[in-house]
Regions:
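Intrinsic disorder
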Residues: 1-58
């Protein structure tokens, strides 16, 4: 989950969006929760097994 925290930091300091690496569904759910707690927006993109989370600012 360290990569999620790094991506959250990048988005909160100015990067428009960040794509995380593809992960299984249970990991993506945890990523979405961390992103929501940081008051950012996230969406999943792609098809399994390459589905990934993208983080945006509000």
């Amino acid at each position: 989950m360290h990569d999620v925290q790094d991506a959250i930091q990048r988005v909160t300091t100015g990067t428009r969006s960040v794509d995380l690496t593809p992960q299984p569904p249970h990991i993506r759910r945890m990523q979405h929760e961390l992103i929501r707690e940081a008051q950012l927006i996230s969406h999943s993109y792609g098809r399994e097994p390459y589905r990934r989370v993208r983080i945006y600012r509000e």
